[in-house]
Amino acid sequence: TVMGAQVKEAAVMLPLYTFCIEFVLGGFKRKDGEWNRPILTLYGILLGLPMVAGLMWVSARMLHFDVVTRMMTEARVMFDYMHWTLLPNLDSLTLFHDDIVPSKGLLDPSTTLAAIVGIAALLAVALWQRKSRPMLALGILWFFSGHLLTGTVIPLILVFEHRNYFPSAGLLLSIAALIPQFNSAWNARAISVGTGCLFLFYAFTTHLRSMEWSSPINLAASDASKRPNSSASQYEYARILLTTTKNGDPEPMRQKAFAILERMAADPNAEATNNQLLIVYANELKRPVDPKWWDSMIAKFSSRKPTSTEATALVALLKCYDAAFCSRDIGHMRAALEAATSHSGGYAMLYAAFGRFAAKYLDNRELAELQFQRAIARAPSDPEYLLQYAELLIESGRFDEAESIIQQLHTLNRFDLLNSQLARIEEGLVRAKSNQTTH
């Protein structure tokens, strides 16, 4: 498990998969029928302690919808995964599925309740068939176990079909476990023909999908056409168009990209990443920046907590300012940062970005200090925010407080990874003290 986790985080689920095997095939019993206490203790440690730690970690790190909303939505998504695995529809096979509307209640949409009941029924079947059809039970448990890490409370994107690598094996195991039930000669022939047709269908669908993957522009265009309301699909298509030419002329592609981005920027349900890309490329191509792009971005940040991709995009836009690559619209940038950081449980990188912006462009050290303090409170073990805060304190002449922050950084300097940053900031502190004494 430890070795696998160095390559792929999903390897941490290996103890849960073996737990399912033990539950179905052994029942945690010894040969004499008594409980196998060492096995129970082992799984209590391997599964119980990480579960408690994980729940504590995610308690304040949710996306802009709460845990209940996420869990209700994921119930519907589980059946989408089953559909895409067993009977894939080319129109539904895309990289992004962010246009799936989160469930707002058990009957909004109505399929939410049906999905929850369906999952409960499948788990009940697994328990019921554990002894008579163990492979059927194990396949069902493996499918849901495979989604326990990414499809429950951890704040990841709601839908990502590539999460089905191992869970799909559980589905196929369950289907394979049912085939022996049809053991007459006629049924055997029917099953052989049906299986052959199914494999031909899978092969043909895979061939069509591979054609869509033939080039980045083909894949992006295909996904965007299938999901016109997917912010991520439209963003990716526009991004690729902006770096593509048609017969050596980039302008037709650029016009198409800007039309896509402007439509998504005006959509209140689309991510603000589209607005950010519009602003950055308008600067790069020496085009005017429409104030409406800023206004709709600010409105999106005001109405809900930014997603992680939106937070990253806004920080990147500020870096575009720092590099003097983008024209500096200080008023709009301040409004965007204020809106993005107005929600509880925000991202530390946004608070730190606001702090840098306040210090550099507003000359407001009080506001900058407040934002850095918020960043450190959200990520107290991240040395980057402490380093930036210490620099601000040194520039403000508050040397004692800066030294206190530097001491905190020394405690975080594991394996001497921060030596160069600490040396730089300590030299700056000594120089600032010397300059103050001289003057």
Could you tell me what each predicted segment is?
Residues T1-N275, V280-K292, P306-A311:
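Polytopic membrane enzymes that build or remodel cell-surface glycoconjugates and lipids
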